[in-house]
Curated annotation (Swiss-Prot):
Its cofactor is [4Fe-4S] cluster; [2Fe-2S] cluster. It holds the Pfam family BATS. Catalyzes the conversion of dethiobiotin (DTB) to biotin by the insertion of a sulfur atom into dethiobiotin via a radical-based mechanism. The gene is bioB. NCBIfam families: bioB. Binds 1 [4Fe-4S] cluster. The cluster is coordinated with 3 cysteines and an exchangeable S-adenosyl-L-methionine. Binds 1 [2Fe-2S] cluster. The cluster is coordinated with 3 cysteines and 1 arginine. Belongs to the radical SAM superfamily. Biotin synthase family. Pathway: Cofactor biosynthesis; biotin biosynthesis; biotin from 7,8-diaminononanoate: step 2/2. This is Biotin synthase. Its EC number is 2.8.1.6.
Length: 367
């Protein structure tokens, strides 16, 4: 079992130059936002300066500037996707946040083998009816890269992907762990255009939460996917005990890898896991994470993912004014989400529309 100490809220690093106060802060942030809209990209030092912004009032100003970047670089379409847990529990890996690990099975994690194609397709149709444009097949385990040559599960998943394309209009995605270049090509040929494989944390912090595989193992899979022409969906979890430097480094690593979609999960501690007694993030700390990710990743699809309801509660709508332009709707892997109708109503109240958001470069090219 990974022994992860419970850490206090990350301390904000001291800025190299003072952050403006009062009304000057809003103008300063808008200037930075305009720089980014015009094509500049923040350095690590500049991004760390943003982490020195504290207090609800100032964080909301940071969010407003991030929302300006989102509006100008991505538009008003909120990317909607849904997932299905196609194989659950008894995972070989020891990710300290996950209740599916065989090293520390969570109290609420179901255990079952690969679902049938019929079960998965039924859920794909339900996701499509709820407004999702993409549907991701998620499986436990380190990856199909390590499957036995006699294992037919990968072929079953490929066939299910083909059937989803034939029987629905929703786009199939996968999250099956590590893949070889050859497997990535097979997924592409079957019709998978986007694949989720989260980095989860910075390279520096990763060994504190996982020891059964490395951060570089995850990077290798992302590179294999992109080489096969598959879009990379990769993000992380906020609230593991990481520092602000770790958060900034994760965002910059995702930028360097040119990922298209970035899920931001907010830790919802699960009993039975090493992080089960962690506190949930403060709402304003979560908003600050979202806004800073948008400053670093101006054109990426940044997605509200796991923990949205648990951490944000009745303030979920603020994330959609803090740089977020995508949502995972419906249920999560081992926990329940709120009804999709509630999400659609929230979007409408904010003047946003659900659909399929542009990937980096698409929105600006269309203007």
């Amino acid at each position: 079992m990974v022994q992860v100490p419970i850490k206090p809220t990350p301390q904000t690093p001291a800025p190299t130059t003072a952050i403006p106060n009062g009304p000057a802060l809003e103008a300063w942030l808008n200037d930075w936002a305009q720089r980014i809209i015009n094509g500049d990209r923040l350095t690590r030092t500049e991004a760390l300066r943003l982490t020195a912004i504290t207090g609800p009032e100032n964080i909301l100003k940071l969010c407003a500037a991030a929302d300006l970047i989102r509006h100008e670089c991505c538009g008003n379409t909120v990317d909607l996707c849904s997932i299905v847990n196609v194989k659950s529990g008894s995972c070989s890996e020891n990710c300290s946040f996950c209740s599916q690990s065989a090293h520390h099975p969570g109290e609420d994690s179901p255990v079952y083998g690969l679902k049938t194609a019929e079960e998965i397709i039924e859920q794909a149709k339900a996701a499509e009816a709820a407004g999702a444009k993409r549907f991701c097949l998620v499986s436990q385990g380190r990856g199909i890269k390590y499957n036995s040559p006699r294992d037919t599960e990968f072929e079953q998943i490929l066939e299910t992907v083909r059937r989803i394309q034939a029987e629905t209009a929703i786009k199939p995605c996968c999250a099956l762990g590590e893949v070889t270049p050859e497997q990535a090509q097979q997924l592409r040929e079957a019709g998978v255009t986007r694949y989720n494989h989260n980095l989860e944390a910075s390279e520096n912090f990763f060994p504190d939460i996982v020891t059964t595989h490395s951060w570089q193992d995850r990077v290798e899979t992302i590179k294999n996917l992109k080489a096969a022409g598959i879009q990379a969906c990769s993000g992380g979890i906020m609230g593991l005990g990481e520092s602000w430097e770790d958060r900034v480094d994760l965002a910059i690593a995702l930028r360097d890898l040119e990922v298209e979609s970035v899920p931001l999960n907010l830790l919802n501690p699960r009993q039975g896991t090493p992080l089960g007694s962690n506190d949930r993030l403060d709402v304003y700390e979560a908003l600050k994470c979202m806004a800073i990710f948008r400053f670093i990743l101006p054109e990426q699809i940044i997605r509200y993912a796991g923990g949205r309801e648990a951490v944000m509660g009745e303030l979920q709508h603020l994330g959609l004014k803090a740089g977020i332009n995508a949502m995972l709707i419906g249920h999560y892997l081992t926990t329940m989400g709120q009804p999709p109708e509630q999400d659609q109503a929230m979007l409408k109240s904010l003047g946003l529309q659900g659909g399929e958001a542009p990937i980096p470069g698409q929105y600006s090219a269309a203007q």
